[in-house]
């Protein structure tokens, strides 16, 4: 019997977190109503500080509402327990304490049998490490993770929770913002999309955007042309960018159409920006995981500055869809995916299994509990997907060479 389970969400937001929490509460209420459910607040921070809520009968009745909610109803944080100095600095543990021991003591104190972690590869492998640590100290904890990341970059998971919704929302964001190219002559409009080292979100958002564009009605005689509302370039970290060649191609677009619209993954060209900052002796801001804080170095503005003059733009406008996209509630496709994974997660918990729930690309796409030792991040977006190749051909953009990218973020 599983007496007590605990849930936490961690890493960046994605359009699945609240729904997954609600789904787990609903499924346990259905399959094992006697099981106690603990919600650790604000991710691993709450676990380390003992900040938690015990789910009440009234809360169970309200769980269905969470399927319509964005963000994380129980809060998130970015905490790397292996980074002891950062944990001490933030007041999560005291000097001389091991964060793993502090977390383990809290789980033992709370009598947790199963820990459900909803996050990316860092979140879930950290939980697996914690379970191994507890086992070595004589306490059995099963960890069952759910794969959350808008980058869809977890190996070997076919589709992570929230990524489809985030791409749809990025497309929706640009459906409004694209009209800004009419505010001034010769506008270079850069849509900066989240994606540290994976171009999935940028590419999928571009594909979704062009799909809806095909069904829109235009009035070319009145200046409302499809070309002005189309995408003229898509840049992702996994593909090289020949700046000079692209500038020449897009300058021709500017002369013909009167504007240039670009979908740019924030991770595209990040190495060039970091190298430039380092050469100037500037400090590159990083988070507790060692990842570059992309929002502070502003890739879109850097790219626009490099490109604006080359394409003959009178105005450069950079618009970021990241927070708009990742904070949305899950769409219908993601809700179906969440339901399937949540149901299996609870079933696995009650059967005594552990692992990261997902469609295993290395096991014929079967939905199963994937062994944690096989889980890792930085799954690159495949630029050779037929649909992406078709997209590039449609907009007249030559495909660049493949690029190996560094480990991503949640």
Swiss-Prot record:
Pathway: Carbohydrate degradation; glycolysis; D-glyceraldehyde 3-phosphate and glycerone phosphate from D-glucose: step 3/4
Cofactor field: Mg(2+)
EC number of the protein: 2.7.1.90
Location in the cell: Cytoplasm
Gene Ontology CC entries for this record: cytoplasm
Active site per UniProt: 151 (proton acceptor)
Protein name: Pyrophosphate--fructose 6-phosphate 1-phosphotransferase
Species the sequence originates in: Mastigamoeba balamuthi
């Amino acid at each position: 019997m599983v007496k007590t389970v605990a849930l936490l969400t961690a890493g960046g937001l994605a359009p699945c977190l609240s729904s997954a929490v609600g789904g787990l509460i609903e499924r346990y209420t259905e399959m094992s109503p006697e099981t106690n459910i603990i919600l650790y607040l604000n991710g691993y921070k709450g676990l380390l500080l003992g900040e938690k809520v015990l789910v009440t009968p009234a809360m169970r009745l309200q769980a269905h509402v969470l399927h319509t909610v964005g963000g994380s109803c129980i809060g998130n944080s970015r905490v790397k327990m292996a980074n002891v100095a950062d944990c001490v600095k933030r007041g999560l543990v005291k000097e001389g304490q091991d964060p793993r021991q502090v977390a383990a003591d809290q789980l033992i104190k709370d009598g947790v049998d199963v820990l459900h972690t909803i996050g990316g590869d860092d979140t879930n492998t950290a939980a697996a490490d914690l379970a191994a640590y507890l086992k070595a100290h004589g306490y059995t904890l099963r960890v069952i993770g759910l794969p959350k990341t808008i980058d869809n970059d977890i190996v070997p998971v076919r589709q992570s929770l929230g990524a489809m919704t985030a791409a749809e929302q990025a497309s929706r964001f640009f459906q409004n913002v694209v009209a800004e190219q009419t505010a001034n002559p010769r506008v270079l409009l850069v849509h900066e999309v989240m994606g540290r080292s994976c171009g999935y979100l940028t590419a999928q958002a571009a594909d979704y955007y062009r799909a809806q564009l095909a069904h829109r009605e235009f009035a070319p005689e009145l200046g409302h042309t499809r070309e002005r509302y189309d995408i003229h370039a898509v840049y992702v970290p996994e593909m090289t960018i020949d700046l000079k060649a692209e500038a020449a191609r897009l300058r021709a677009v500017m002369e013909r159409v009167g504007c240039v619209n670009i979908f740019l993954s924030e991770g595209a060209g990040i190495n060039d920006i970091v190298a430039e900052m380092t050469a100037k002796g500037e400090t590159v801001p990083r988070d507790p995981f060692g990842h570059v804080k992309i929002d502070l170095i502003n890739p879109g503005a850097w790219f626009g500055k490099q490109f604006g003059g080359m394409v003959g733009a009178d105005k450069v406008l950079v618009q970021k869809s990241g927070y708009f996209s990742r904070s949305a509630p899950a769409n219908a496709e993601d809700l179906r995916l969440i339901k399937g994974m949540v149901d299996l997660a609870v079933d696995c918990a009650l059967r005594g299994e552990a692992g990261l729930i997902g469609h295993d690309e290395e096991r014929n796409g079967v939905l199963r509990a994937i062994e944690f030792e096989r889980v890792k991040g930085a799954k690159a977006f495949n630029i050779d997907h037929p649909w992406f190749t078709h997209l590039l051909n449609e907009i007249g953009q030559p495909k660049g060479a493949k690029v190996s990218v560094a480990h991503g973020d949640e």
